[in-house]
Amino acid sequence: MGQKVHPYGFRLGYNKNWQSRWFSKKEYPGFVFEDHNIRKFVKKTLYHAGLSKIEIERAGGKVRLILSTARPGIVIGRKGVEIEKLRGDLRKKFKREFSIEVNEIRRPEVEAQLVAENIALQLERRVAFRRAMKRTVSMSRKFGAEGIKVTCSGRLAGAEIARTEWYRDGRVPLQTLRADIDFGFAEARTTYGVIGVKVWIFKGEILDNEVEQ
């Protein structure tokens, strides 16, 4: 039976870049754990801001966060109030100096993480899983995705036995290294249990072999 490698890790250094960019000899395990906690804290604080990616860079004891979001206004706030509050909360919790950069996502419909979270939200609101998948897939295709695949796993529609259902439209060449594949995962917490949602989006081929910045 064929197994799926993570499409992001598979392309690291080829046409994808690391989301944690730093080097350390002695403090490596501590930094990895701290990165995990920083992402968890930011995601929880900005759960309503449509965060797709949280990149972390470290240099000289300072931490630089690069947030990719569909709603930069919510992250920054009026006159930068919200972003200053977030910086203060991070400094207080992790005892480090933080700088935060915000990048706006122009087309959230083709960002796999946001698409997965959108489907999970629909499932929590009791929308039928097939309708949620088909609606989202057609929307992504309309906004320029060359291919998209969605899987939902769990007690779908309240069934006694958990199963996996999937829906695909267009090409999603997971084994082609030059293919720009975006991957996202989210969980829907329903009354019947947790439903896992995975999304793969094919955005075209990167022919010049450049690593994304």
UniProtKB/Swiss-Prot annotation:
Tell me which InterPro entries the record gives. KH_dom, KH_dom-like_a/b, KH_dom_type_2, KH_sf_prok-type, Ribosomal_S3_C_sf, Ribosomal_uS3_bac-typ, Ribosomal_uS3_C, Ribosomal_uS3_CS
Q: Which UniProt keywords apply?
A: Ribonucleoprotein, Ribosomal protein, RNA-binding, rRNA-binding
Q: Which Pfam families match?
A: KH_2 (PF07650), Ribosomal_S3_C (PF00189)
Indicate the segments annotated as coiled coil, or none if absent.
none
Task: Give the GO cellular component terms, alphabetically.
Answer: cytosolic small ribosomal subunit
Q: Which CDD domains match?
A: KH-II_30S_S3
Q: Which residues form the KH type-2 domain?
A: 38-106
A GO BP entry is: translation
A molecular function GO annotation: structural constituent of ribosome
Functional summary from the UniProt entry: Binds the lower part of the 30S subunit head. Binds mRNA in the 70S ribosome, positioning it for translation.
Its quaternary organisation is: Part of the 30S ribosomal subunit. Forms a tight complex with proteins S10 and S14.
Report the sequence similarity comment from the record.
Answer: Belongs to the universal ribosomal protein uS3 family.
Q: What is this protein identified as?
A: Small ribosomal subunit protein uS3
Organism from which the protein derives: Nitratidesulfovibrio vulgaris (strain DSM 19637 / Miyazaki F) (Desulfovibrio vulgaris)
Q: Which gene encodes it?
A: rpsC
